[in-house]
Amino acid sequence: MSKSRAEAAAGAPGIILRYLQEQNRPYSAQDVFGNLQKEHGLGKAAVVKALDQLAQEGKIKEKTYGKQKIYFADQNQFDTVSDADLHGLDASIVALTAKVQSLQQSCRHMEAELKELTSALTTPEMQKEIQELKKECAQYTERLKNIKAATNHVTPEEKEKVYRDRQKYCKEWRKRKRMTTELCDAILEGYPKSKKQFFEEVGIETDEDHNVLLPDP
């Protein structure tokens, strides 16, 4: 046995006694070994020997269930707990449980919000998308204008397709504008400056900046 392992074995009874008193719950020798081996370097044989020694000295209690022994702290060393103390502990448990549930719910909300933010477009991507949509809208507006001015050259089917496309792109416009607004609002919750200053810093230009109105549905 190495010197460090021998030193650990010599101190095993004290370490295990403190552990059982602090935890105040039953453990098997395997449980104690698994819980203390990494931190204190105790071997399985040293743990079993220390538990048997502590039980023989009356410092801990042991119970045998079939082929397994269970060890736990002597309950006589602990102060008697009154009914009032127990009720107080129960109330504390209820309050802490409610707090934990509230925090878990908050965590779920924040995780959902984070997922939404991380899946959203970045500012450069939004700017590029906006420019592309503006270009497409201008093209379709010009096309629609020409179609309206020359209805004799447009079949009802073509006209209907153009109007359907217009509704489709207007709907997409509204959707992306709403997504952009929600994303900016989420960012602004933790942004120290005003919304106007934020837009100026990242280079966001709104429809209103260019007097662009979203067409009616």
UniProtKB/Swiss-Prot annotation:
SUPFAM superfamilies, alphabetized: Winged helix' DNA-binding domain (SSF46785)
One Pfam family in the UniProt entry: LZ3wCH
One Gene Ontology molecular-function label: transcription coactivator activity
Top-level taxon of the source organism: Eukaryota
Keywords assigned: Coiled coil, DNA recombination, DNA-binding, Meiosis, Nucleus
Tissue spec: Highly expressed in testis and more specifically in spermatocytes. Detected in spleen, ovary and thymus.
Coiled-coil residue spans: 84-152
Inactivation phenotype: Infertility. Males exhibit testicular hypoplasia with lack of spermatozoa. Spermatocytes arrest at the stage of pachytene-like chromosome condensation and spermatogenesis is blocked at prophase of meiosis I. Axial elements are fully developed, but synapsis is limited. While meiotic double-stranded breaks are formed and processed, they fail to be repaired.
Positions of region (DNA-binding): 118-182
Gene3D superfamilies in the record: Winged helix-like DNA-binding domain superfamily/Winged helix DNA-binding domain
Subunit structure, as described in the record: Interacts with the DNA-binding domain of the nuclear receptors NR3C1/GR, ESR2/ER-beta, THRB and RXRA. Forms a stable heterodimer with MND1. Interacts with PSMC3/TBP1.
Family as reported in the entry's similarity comment: Belongs to the HOP2 family.
Protein name, as recorded: Homologous-pairing protein 2 homolog
